UniProtKB/Swiss-Prot annotation:
Segments crossing the lipid bilayer: 33-53, 77-98, 113-133, 178-198, 226-246, 288-308, 320-340, 347-367
Annotated keywords: Electron transport, Heme, Iron, Membrane, Metal-binding, Mitochondrion, Mitochondrion inner membrane, Respiratory chain, Transmembrane, Transmembrane helix, Transport, Ubiquinone
Binding site for a ubiquinone: H201
Superkingdom assignment: Eukaryota
Role according to the record: Component of the ubiquinol-cytochrome c reductase complex (complex III or cytochrome b-c1 complex) that is part of the mitochondrial respiratory chain. The b-c1 complex mediates electron transfer from ubiquinol to cytochrome c. Contributes to the generation of a proton gradient across the mitochondrial membrane that is then used for ATP synthesis.
Topological category with respect to the lipid bilayer: Multi-pass membrane protein
Gene designation per UniProt: MT-CYB
GO CC term (a single one): mitochondrial inner membrane
PROSITE patterns: CYTB_CTER, CYTB_NTER
PANTHER family per the UniProt record, alphabetical: CYTOCHROME B
A Pfam family this chain is assigned to: Cytochrom_B_C
Protein name: Cytochrome b
Primary location group: mitochondrion
Binding, heme b b562: H83, H182
Length: 379
């Protein structure tokens, strides 16, 4: 009798994805982040579901309902902080996952990569809407500032913003629809993840050398299941240390003040994981130009397959590109720092320099370095 694992219509899908999946034997810990992102998504959906049971999406009671969750619901404080800090862990894993893809040339799998970029956009939209829900000062003003950016779109901008708001300012209608979208989007993300995996398993995983590894593959289970479990334990440990010892470390104190449309906070800024994009937005004096730069700073990821000039896939044997990659990483850290600073000298100049460097490295310097490395191969 054949094994049910290999014959049952449903179980065999799981088998081909997580058990008998042929996997390159040399993939490093950088390949752990895919499974960690899956774990983060599950944590966020579960904690979010329990929070939604007690949350009310009304401007009068939203802030109080979050307070009620933290004070009166059994382990409500724990669920709330796991959800808030889980988002931070999600983005840490996300950025490392994307960085791994850039470093090792995983973007040559077009479909997998492009679905991944769409996933990144969707997750960013979900996180932004989730940040609005507690209805604190930074929630309200963050929502006002970011949605207002759409007014930069010529001709239809103002109408579009009022349509999204459901009125003439961020109010009850906005909060209700943001809650609805924040609830539904994680399930759309889960569906997109399935498509992401579907395309990945069409080609098989990349590996650190960037070479074809068909002759040297091992089954996913037990080798990589145990490796993923180790990663999951480390992620859970980090998350719980954050939640139980300093749950507000990555948050904004302004969000413990109920939203007040009559009082603007001195420095409006988003959560830390959006600061790099916010810095790029701020560094351009023109509103429409800033919005375009903001969108393009993420959309530029879709250009990587076109900009790939090297005859080698990854950067493992390309020291010049490696150097540029780490300069780009340092530049993103600089942008993140600048995004959290007030808009004044010298931060404006640093932000503008870092923004120009970001686009220049990706669009001009990296492709040129790749072409130079191709020439050096002939020596």
């Amino acid at each position: 009798m054949t094994n049910i694992r290999k014959t049952h219509p449903l179980i065999k899908i799981v088998n081909h994805s997580f058990i008998d999946l042929p996997t390159p034997s040399n993939i490093s810990a950088w390949w752990n982040f895919g499974s960690l992102l899956g774990l983060c998504l599950i944590i966020q959906i579960l904690t979010g579901l329990f929070l939604a049971m007690h949350y009310t999406s009304d401007t009068m009671t939203a802030f109080s309902s979050v307070t009620h969750i933290c004070r009166d619901v059994n382990y409500g404080w724990l669920i709330r902080y796991i959800h808030a800090n889980g988002a931070s862990m999600f983005f840490i894993c996300l950025y490392l996952h994307v960085g791994r893809g850039l470093y090792y040339g995983s973007y040559t799998y077009f479909e997998t990569w492009n679905i991944g970029v769409i996933l990144l956009f969707t997750i960013m939209a979900t996180a932004f809407m989730g940040y609005v829900l507690p209805w604190g000062q930074m929630s309200f003003w963050g929502a006002t500032v970011i949605t207002n950016l759409l007014s930069a779109i010529p001709y239809i901008g103002t109408n579009l913003v009022e349509w999204i708001w459901g009125g003439f300012s961020v109010d009850k209608a906005t909060l209700t629809r943001f809650f609805a979208f924040h609830f539904i989007l994680p399930f759309i993300i889960a569906a997109l993840v399935m498509v992401h995996l579907l395309f990945l398993h069409e080609t098989g995983s990349n590996n650190p050398s960037g070479l074809v590894s068909d002759s040297d593959k091992v089954p996913f289970h037990p080798y990589f299941t145990i490796k993923d479990i180790l990663g999951a334990l480390l992620l859970t440990l980090t998350l719980m240390l954050l939640v139980l010892f300093s749950p507000d470390l990555l948050g904004d104190p302004d969000n413990y003040t109920p939203a007040n449309p009559l009082n603007t906070p001195p420095h409006i800024k988003p959560e830390w994981y959006f600061l790099f994009a916010y810095a790029i937005l701020q560094s351009i004096p023109n509103k429409l130009g800033g919005v375009l730069a903001l969108v393009f700073s993420i959309l530029i990821l879709m250009l990587f397959p076109i900009l790939h000039m090297s005859k080698q896939r990854g950067m493992m044997f390309r020291p010049l590109s490696q150097c540029l990659f780490w300069i780009l990483a340092a530049d993103l850290f600089t942008l993140t720092w600048i995004g959290g600073q007030p808009v004044e000298h010298p931060f404006i100049v640093i932000g503008q320099t870092a923004s120009i460097l970001y686009f220049t490295i990706i669009l001009i310097i990296l492709p040129l370095a790749s072409m130079l490395e191709n020439k050096l191969l002939k020596w």
